[in-house]
A protein has these predicted regions:
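C-terminal beta-signal and adjacent terminal beta-strands/loops
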Residues: 4, 532, 629, 695-700, ...
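Short acidic/polar hinge/loop motifs at secondary-structure boundaries
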Residues: 59, 181-208
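N-terminal periplasmic accessory domains that precede
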Residues: 86-91, 136-139, 157-159, 174-179, ...
Length: 781
């Protein structure tokens, strides 16, 4: 009896000593505002799971001042508790992993990926920042069918399911949108106003293949980029510094705040890179502000202002022998004349509005303007060089009206909209003069001066029908037009004025997509789409006093069939797509009798492929020592062939032009197999680790398929420790890139054999390199 009384007394004493509190709340999706069920809420020894309507109730000790919210489909979030804690409204941000819940913007659907027809690659902020944060190249290359390459830090090429045969520099045939505002130029190329910095990007969606039905001209694909945002209900300041091999250093600072009606973030980035190779530096300074304002329940405003200034060196292509001898060397002409973008400045401003007229009718509109300047000594020899001074300014906008209606068992959604872009470009090119090798060159005689006004318009309409038996049908199309108004300002008795207006015929590009849900966790989709890819400015200008008025756009038709879903209690996600695309009127380079290169329509290709993305969530439990562990694999198979393809090359020994037939050959620059795989691990104590491996098959380097780049493998890894101490969050990390010290060239210069022997195909990438750094975050609210 005494023992029983003593037990009761001790129980009451301990219960009073460790007082309990009950916390209630609701968890919703940040984007859709829909309730999130199955989220795990932990605090001290307390643990519970959110219900079907997102509600939860948890009992925790009084001394516990935070809750950890985790879900397989969302980013883990730590919530600080006030005293006393009110009813908690918690919004979770999708981690873009679970296909049954993740929603996408692609094709203006704004619906679950499982209900969307088409191949779409997804990257969230965590995936974009798995490495050293120099750029998003390592992350983008984990998407099957996507290849991002770099001449140097800040100078990129991107291919989506395609060859870079006609893309000597920059980004071609890929449409880019920032928060639904178009940022590519009217001709489909991209300029320096687009900064691929992981610190300012919140998510990336990649639409593969022709997307002209809703996003204007292009056969390559679309990048939909959204900026990062402040965490819900939080005000914080963050700073970080990273240092690494080959003179890499990076400083980043940001201020973020989120309240009931506003989400504002300001970023500052200063990055320096001396470069792996000689004359291969890359420096940039970026400042930007992004804001999202809720004016009233019917109206949301988004604003961005960004400015980038920088410079980058161009080391030039090397032959295989030169690369094997010393991969860090620059082409001698490039080093002697500091071939580079000596300085670039780019500013972009955009504002967009979402207005809801009713529950069934809304409008989204955005406008932008940008300004850019370049100082660019270029070339590779005394026979090919120049000093370009260029300035660009432009403006444009995009609008869409969305109407929803329900009739019986059929739900309909109609999108009608348009897009307009204008760009004013003035360029003056001089001969390069340099009396002292290794110093900056000077302007010589002017040999080209022009003004180009580019205009692009698109009108689109799309209907989505949710049909009985879990069928989802999408039918749409766009009507696009592009024109160049060129004014030749160079006056000389020996020069032919090539001023003129080049207007391409308007083109209608339709798309049809169908999805069938096979239960809650599996869907099959099929689509057919037409593409229309007008030639960019560098294919219009022959650079010999003539205008290439005979060239016209490439046309493509694409067929896709795919299967996506998740199995094994939402642990295994898979997304598999097969496709076949026929491209006609392919633009090919032609070497002219005077040695210059022009372009013409002279080919067609057949492009067959398979893409697969698999993700397995081994562990997702915030209470376990290893709280998160997932593995993933990305694979692409590409069987691209020239159907009818003839080119011309110049025989320097006989000074004659030779016509070559490459029909039946593999398409230049497309590797048959590419694969990436990785593991991501997080622990309860704050230690985290990730590793990524890449494999790229041998790649044909010229149209004749007589030269190939060797296959190669690359491995990257990162290790870090995160810790929260009251209002401070610390992240210390270190990593290694190219752990195997593989000698490879990420960026290849195709058909370089046309310029003599030995051909300089290679632009060697960095060998084994290391980095380390720290981030500090102060939570003010």
């Amino acid at each position: 009896m005494k023992r029983y009384i003593l037990f009761i007394f001790l129980s009451l004493f301990i219960n009073n000593l460790i007082a309990q509190q009950i916390i209630k709340g609701k968890i919703t999706d940040y984007n859709t505002k829909e309730p999130v069920s199955g989220a795990t809420i932990t605090g001290g020894s307390g643990k519970t799971v959110s219900s079907e309507n997102g509600h939860f109730e948890i009992k925790i000790p009084d001394f516990v001042k935070s809750l950890i919210i985790s879900h397989v489909s969302y980013e883990t979030q730590e919530i600080q508790l006030s005293d006393p804690s009110p009813f908690l409204e918690i919004s979770l941000i999708s981690n873009m992993m679970n296909l049954s819940t993740v929603r996408v913007t692609g094709y203006e659907n704004n619906r679950r990926l499982m209900e969307t027809a088409g191949a779409i690659g997804l990257l969230n902020a965590q995936q974009l920042r798995r490495g050293d944060n120099m750029d998003i190249l390592p992350a983008l290359n984990t998407i099957p069918g996507v290849k991002m390459e770099a001449y140097s830090a800040g100078n990129y090429r991107i291919a989506i399911r395609g060859s870079l045969i006609n893309n000597p520099w920059g980004i071609r045939n890929v449409r880019i949108y920032w928060n639904e505002i178009p940022l590519s130029s009217p001709d489909g190329t991209a300029q320096k106003s687009i900064d691929f910095d992981p610190a300012i990007i919140g998510s990336v969606e990649v639409l593969k293949g022709p997307s002209g039905s809703i996003y204007g001209a292009g056969n390559g694909g679309v990048l939909l980029i959204k900026n990062s945002k402040a965490e819900i209900g939080q005000t914080a300041a963050e700073t970080g510094y990273t240092a690494g091999s080959y003179g890499f250093s990076r400083f980043h600072a940001s201020f973020k705040t989120s309240g009931d009606n506003a989400n504002v973030i300001a970023n500052l980035v200063s990055q320096r890179y001396e470069g792996y190779r000689e004359n291969n530096w890359g420096n940039k300074d970026v400042i930007n502000i992004f804001s999202q304002l809720t004016v009233n329940p019917e109206r949301n405003l988004n604003l961005f202002v960004t400015h980038t200034t920088g410079s980058l060196g161009i080391a030039g292509g090397l032959s295989k022998e030169q690369m094997d001898e010393n991969p860090r060397q620059a082409l001698q002409f490039n080093k002697d004349n500091k071939i580079s973008v000596k300085k670039y400045d780019a500013t972009a401003v955009g504002i967009s509005q979402i207005y809801r007229f009713s529950d069934n009718f809304s409008n989204t509109s955005g406008i932008y303007t940008n300004f850019q300047t370049y100082d660019h000594p270029y070339g590779s020899s005394i026979y090919y060089n120049g000093y370009l001074h260029e300035s660009l300014s432009g403006y444009g906008g995009r609008t869409k009206f969305v109407w929803n209606n329900q009739t019986g068992k059929i739900s309909a959604r109609i999108n009608i909209g348009g897009e307009y872009q204008y760009q004013y470009q003035i360029a003056n090119t001089y001969e390069v003069i340099n009396d002292q090798p290794g110093t900056w060159p000077e302007d010589g005689d002017l040999f080209q001066s022009d003004i180009v006004k580019s205009k692009a318009t698109a009108v689109f309409v799309q209907a989505e029908l949710d049909l009985p038996c879990n069928f989802f049908l999408t039918v749409g199309g766009s009507y696009t037009r592009l024109s160049y108004d060129i004014l030749d300002l160079f006056k000389s008795s020996s020069h032919t004025d090539y001023s003129g207006l080049l207007r391409f015929p308007a083109k209608f590009s339709p798309r049809v997509g169908l999805v069938k849900l096979l239960g809650e966790y599996l869907s099959v989709h099929a689509s057919t789409s037409y593409g229309y890819s007008p030639p960019p400015l560098w294919e219009i200008n022959n650079y010999d006093g003539t205008l290439n008025k005979s060239i016209f756009p490439e046309d493509g038709i694409n067929y896709e069939l795919g299967l996506r879903g998740n199995l094994l209690n939402n642990k295994l996600d898979f997304d598999i797509t097969t496709y076949q695309m026929f491209l006609k009127n392919a633009v090919v380079p032609v070497v002219r009798p005077n040695g210059t290169t022009a372009y013409k329509n002279a080919g067609s290709t057949t492009q067959k492929g398979l893409e697969a993305m698999l993700t397995y969530q081994f562990i997702s439990d915030a209470t376990k020592p290893v709280s998160q562990m997932k593995g993933w694999l990305s694979y692409a198979y590409s069987n691209y062939k020239f159907r009818e393809y003839t080119t011309q090359s110049y025989d320097w020994s006989t000074n004659t032009v030779i016509t070559l037939d490459h029909s039946g050959n593999k398409v230049t620059g497309v590797m048959p197999h590419s694969l990436s795989a990785g593991i991501d691990l997080e622990t309860k104590c704050g230690i985290y680790f990730n590793t990524t491996g890449y494999y790229y098959d041998k790649t044909p380097l010229n149209d004749a398929n007589t030269y190939y780049a060797d296959a190669y493998t690359q491995i990257n890894a990162k290790f870090g420790y995160k810790k929260s101490i009251r209002c401070f969050q610390v992240d210390i990390f270190a990593g290694i890139n190219n752990a195997g010290n593989t000698q490879y060239s990420s960026l290849l210069l195709y058909n370089a054999d046309a310029n003599g022997v030995p051909p300089q195909f290679y632009n060697p990438s960095a060998g084994r390199n290391f980095y380390g750094g720290m981030k500090l975050k102060l939570v003010l609210k």
